């Protein structure tokens, strides 16, 4: 069945060097290769809607995590940390939903020493939503679900205030392809490969996706 699916793709990819070879031969970026493959399975509208649905879920997850305080369920008396981190970073600026929140963060002056705090806050927020049985995007797993949304949010609110749906879709397509290569050739399961099989893969996915939106080459 897998061979049949790969055969229908214009650019069948099992390994990273195959992906790079297609990029070089076709003079395309990774997101463009992924997009052409996706079009064999769903319409352009479906691709657009599904990618933005993923991002909406990620954004909502960060929003909920940053605005929920108290003790996490489970009986270990673990206190939520994202709420206080976020409160100290954003101050008293007004907003009413995840998207107005994103715009407000864009308007704040983010000092260099605060960048890592913001990224950590976003990632912790997702982890805490996961720990409290909330909805997260497995990217590539529940345990490492905070990395992709945190890095993409960093890009949108700190690095590129003009970025929008185009960059979000490119980021997610590249991240997904890199995660898929790991899943085909190794594992994304911490139970099988140790913690680095989760956080290591999600970090590689985020790094490759960041390279795309920052204008890097497929080789990079």
Predicted regions and their residues:
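Phenylalanine-focused residue identity feature
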Residues: 9-11, 22, 35, 112, ...
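Accessory "access/gating" subregions that flank catalytic or transport cores
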Residues: 45-194
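Mobile "lid/hinge" segments at catalytic clefts and subdomain interfaces of large enzymes
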Residues: 1-45, 53, 217-220
């Amino acid at each position: 069945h897998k061979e049949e699916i790969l055969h229908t793709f214009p650019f069948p990819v099992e390994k990273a060097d195959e992906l790079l070879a297609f990029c070089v031969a076709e003079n395309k970026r990774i997101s463009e290769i992924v997009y052409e493959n996706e079009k064999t399975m769903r319409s352009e509208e479906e691709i657009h809607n599904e990618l933005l649905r993923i991002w909406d879920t990620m954004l909502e997850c960060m929003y909920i995590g940053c605005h929920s305080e108290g003790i996490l369920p489970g009986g270990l008396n673990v206190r939520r940390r994202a709420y206080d981190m976020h409160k100290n970073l954003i101050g008293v600026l007004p907003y009413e939903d995840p998207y107005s929140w994103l715009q407000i963060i864009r308007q704040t002056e983010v000092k260099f020493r605060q960048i890592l705090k913001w990224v950590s806050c976003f990632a912790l927020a997702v982890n805490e939503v996961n720990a409290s049985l909330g909805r997260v995007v497995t990217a590539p797993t529940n345990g490492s679900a905070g990395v992709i949304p945190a890095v993409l949010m960093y890009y949108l609110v700190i690095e590129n205030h003009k970025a929008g749906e185009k960059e979000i879709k490119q980021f997610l397509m590249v991240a997904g392809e890199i995660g898929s290569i790991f899943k085909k050739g190794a594992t994304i399961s911490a139970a099988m490969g140790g913690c680095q099989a989760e956080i290591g893969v999600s970090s590689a996915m985020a790094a490759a996706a960041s390279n795309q939106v920052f204008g890097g080459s497929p080789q990079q």
